Regions:
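A conserved beta-strand-to-alpha-helix junction within the catalytic ATP-binding
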Residues: 71-85
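Short conserved segment of the HATPase_c
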Residues: 105, 160-173
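Conserved glycine-rich
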Residues: 97, 199-202
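Conserved micro-motifs of the catalytic ATP-binding
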Residues: 65-70, 109-113
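Conserved catalytic submotifs in the C-terminal HATPase_c
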Residues: 71-73, 98-108
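Short helix-loop "hinge" at the ATP-lid/N-box region of the Bergerat-fold HATPase_c
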Residues: 127-129
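Short alpha-helical segment of the dimerization/phosphotransfer core of two-component systems
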Residues: 45-50
């Protein structure tokens, strides 16, 4: 199945790139017909969405089999978390999401891949920005627990999720209440696979509309 996904994704990329290039050329033309301009805009948005889906499929396929390059170095999770959070200020502000960050003064030093850890944080925060109930708080805790570093993300979902955390992690499975939001639904699955190739663990807990993601990594000290 993984090989099939990879092959199909590669086969789609070539004609899709051609479509995107032609749409770009059309957008540069001086078109007076407002309906035609609107159609071109739809083509541009949907082709970009399809491109992102293909990229997610390829990454999910590689990550699920562990077929990714991993360069482990000593990192401080708290610093990288704060940096990634800073990139979401604008998105969270649009939904009036208030981040409550509770970060330990202790260093959370782990052996991990900087690029993959960033992608894990990015996918989790992107999921929150899409599905969290507007005008609510997002709680993020980063702490030491024995020989482990733990980072948890908690938010209130827009709608109750009538599935378990395990079901949500299944590829291509998303709660019915989320289907009106664009996206591949692969973000958390990719985050889980990338966490595991770095010897970490990602768990999801769902209780009604309460959504929690917890990351655990062995401390390198």
């Amino acid at each position: 199945k993984t090989e099939l996904i990879t092959n199909v994704s590669h086969d789609i990329k070539t004609p899709l790139t051609s479509i995107i290039n032609y749409v770009d050329l059309l957008e540069k033309e001086e078109i007076e017909n407002e309906t035609a301009k609107e159609y071109i805009g739809v083509l541009s948005r949907q082709s970009a969405r399809l491109k992102k889906l293909v990229e997610d499929l390829l990454e999910a396929s590689k990550a699920s089999t562990g077929n990714v390059n991993v360069n482990l170095t000593q990192l401080e999770l708290g610093i990288l978390l704060s940096q990634t959070l800073g990139e979401y200020d604008e998105k969270f502000s649009k939904s009036n999401l208030q981040v409550v960050l509770n970060k330990t003064d202790d260093l959370l030093l782990v052996m991990a891949d900087n690029r993959h850890i960033w992608r894990v944080f990015d996918n989790i925060l992107n999921n929150i920005s899409k599905y969290a109930q507007p005008n609510t708080r997002v709680y993020i805790d980063a702490k030491r627990n024995g020989k482990m570093a733990e980072i948890s993300f908690r938010n209130i979902s827009k709608d109750p999720l009538n599935i378990s955390g395990d079901e949500l992690m299944e590829r291509f499975v998303r709660g019915d209440s989320s289907r009106n939001t664009e996206g591949s639904g692969l973000g958390l699955s990719i985050a889980k696979s990338l966490t595991e190739v770095q010897k970490g663990k990602l768990d999801i807990q769902i209780d009604g509309d309460l959504f929690k993601v917890q990351l655990t990594f062995p401390l390198s000290e």
